[in-house]
C-alpha cells in the first residue's frame, strides 16, 4: 500500500493547525480516549475499543488509518480509516471521529478526502469502491461524505444499538469507470422498484429499467424448526473455510463469520457475523446452499431475535430473483442497493447487490435527520415497508 506522508491542515472554526499522518501503535491509548469522547461507552466497533484489533489494523497492509494531531498540544483531534481485505477491491470507511473540541472546522472532510485520494486513485492498490454506513442523528456526517464524492444508496432502519437504537445510511464512492460497467438485470421482484428508481436518479443513469414481476412463491416453510447458535469465533472460522474453500462461492466483503446457526436435524448451516454490542447480525453464507436455508428464514430470524438481535441483514445479488423473493416473503425490506459491488471473475463487468433488512423492534423515525439527497431513500423504504406490513383495505360496495 502507498505510504502516507504527513500533511497539515488548518481547521477554520478554531484556527488550529493539525498534522495528518498514519496511525501508529503508540496512538492506541489516545485513540481509545478519542472514540470514548465522541461516542461514549457504546461504540460497537473493535476499531475504537479493542487494543489488540486496533494494533492489527494499524499493521494491516490492506488498511489505511489516518489520525489528525493538534500541532499545539499534540493531542489527537480526529481519526478515520479505510479498511480492506486480501482478494477484495472494496473498502469500508470507518471510525470517522473528530474530538468535540475540534468540530465545525472541516477536519472530518479533510480526513475523508486524504483517505479517498489514496485508495481510489490510480495505483496498483486502487479500490473499485469504498462504502460507509453513516449515522442519521444529524445531517453533518451525511454532508461530510457527500462533499467527498460519496452517493447515498439506502437507509438501514434500526441497524445498530448505540445508546439507543439508531438507523444508518449507506453511501459509496466508486473509482472512475466502474459504474459504467454494471451488468444489466432483465427483471426484479416488484417490491424493489421504488429503491431502484431512487438509485437511478441518484446515479443519473438513463438506461432501461429492469422489468418488474411478482415475487416468486415462498419456499416451503419450516417456521417450527429448532435452531442452535454456536458462538465460538475460531471454530466458526475454521468450519466456514472448510465448507467454503473457494472464495468465489460466497460474497460478503469485510465481514468474517463469528457465529453459526445449525438446524437440529443438520439440514443446513448458516454462517453469520453477530455483533452483541450493537445487537445486529449479517447473514453471510449457507451450507449446503442458500436455497436449502431459504425455507428456514422465519426460524433463523426468530432465533436471532430471541438471542437479543434487533436487526438482521443479508446481501443478495440483484440478478437472483429467487433468493430476493424468499427474503421478501419473510418480511425483509429492500433497504439499499450497492451498484457495481462485485466484479466478474474476468473483470469485465460488475454486479449490483441488494441489502435486505429486517428489524424485530419498533422503528421510530422521529429522531432520524436526513439530508436532502437521502430523503428519497427514506421515502422508498417507507413505501416498501407499507407494502409488506400494512394490509390492503377494500371498501365494501
Region roles according to the model:
Residues 119-135, 306-316:
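Conserved GNAT acetyl-CoA-binding A-motif
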Residues 207-313:
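Non-catalytic interaction/regulatory modules that flank or connect domains
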Amino acid at each position: 500500500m502507498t505510504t502516507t506522508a504527513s500533511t497539515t491542515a488548518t481547521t477554520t472554526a478554531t484556527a488550529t493547525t493539525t498534522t495528518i499522518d498514519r496511525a501508529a501503535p503508540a496512538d492506541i491509548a489516545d485513540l481509545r480516549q478519542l472514540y470514548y469522547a465522541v461516542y461514549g461507552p457504546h461504540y460497537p466497533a473493535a476499531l475504537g475499543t479493542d487494543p489488540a484489533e486496533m494494533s492489527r489494523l494499524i499493521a494491516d497492509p490492506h488498511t489505511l488509518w489516518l489520525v489528525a494531531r493538534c500541532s499545539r498540544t499534540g493531542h489527537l483531534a480526529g481519526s478515520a480509516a479505510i479498511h480492506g481485505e486480501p482478494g477484495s477491491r472494496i473498502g469500508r470507511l470507518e471510525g470517522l471521529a473528530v474530538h468535540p473540541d475540534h468540530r465545525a472546522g472541516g477536519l472530518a472532510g479533510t480526513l475523508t478526502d486524504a483517505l479517498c485520494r489514496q485508495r481510489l486513485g490510480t495505483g496498483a492498490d486502487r479500490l473499485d469502491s469504498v462504502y460507509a454506513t453513516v449515522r442519521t442523528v444529524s445531517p453533518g456526517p451525511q454532508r461530510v461524505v457527500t462533499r467527498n464524492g460519496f452517493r447515498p444508496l439506502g437507509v438501514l432502519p434500526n441497524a445498530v444499538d448505540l445508546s439507543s437504537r439508531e438507523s444508518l445510511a449507506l453511501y459509496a464512492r466508486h473509482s472512475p469507470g466502474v459504474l459504467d460497467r454494471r451488468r444489466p438485470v432483465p427483471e426484479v421482484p416488484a417490491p424493489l422498484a421504488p429503491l431502484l428508481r431512487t438509485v437511478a436518479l441518484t446515479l443519473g443513469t438513463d438506461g432501461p429499467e429492469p422489468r418488474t414481476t411478482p415475487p416468486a412463491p415462498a419456499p416451503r416453510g419450516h417456521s417450527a424448526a429448532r435452531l442452535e447458535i454456536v458462538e465460538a469465533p475460531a471454530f466458526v472460522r475454521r468450519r466456514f473455510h472448510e465448507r467454503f474453500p473457494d472464495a468465489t462461492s460466497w460474497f460478503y466483503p469485510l465481514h468474517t463469520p463469528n457465529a453459526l446457526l445449525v438446524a437440529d436435524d443438520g439440514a443446513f448451516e448458516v454462517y453469520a457475523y453477530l455483533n452483541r454490542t450493537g445487537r445486529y447480525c449479517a447473514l453471510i453464507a449457507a451450507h449446503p446452499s442458500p436455497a436449502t436455508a431459504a425455507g428456514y428464514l422465519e426460524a433463523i430470524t426468530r432465533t436471532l431475535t430471541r438471542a437479543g438481535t434487533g436487526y438482521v441483514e443479508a446481501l443478495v445479488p440483484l440478478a437472483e430473483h429467487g433468493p430476493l423473493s424468499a427474503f421478501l416473503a419473510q418480511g425483509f425490506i429492500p433497504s439499499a442497493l450497492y451498484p457495481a459491488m462485485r466484479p466478474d471473475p474476468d473483470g469485465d463487468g460488475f454486479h449490483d447487490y441488494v441489502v435486505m433488512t429486517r428489524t424485530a423492534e419498533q422503528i421510530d423515525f422521529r429522531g432520524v435527520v436526513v439530508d436532502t439527497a437521502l430523503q428519497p431513500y427514506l421515502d422508498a423504504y417507507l413505501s416498501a415497508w407499507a407494502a409488506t406490513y400494512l394490509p390492503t383495505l377494500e371498501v365494501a360496495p
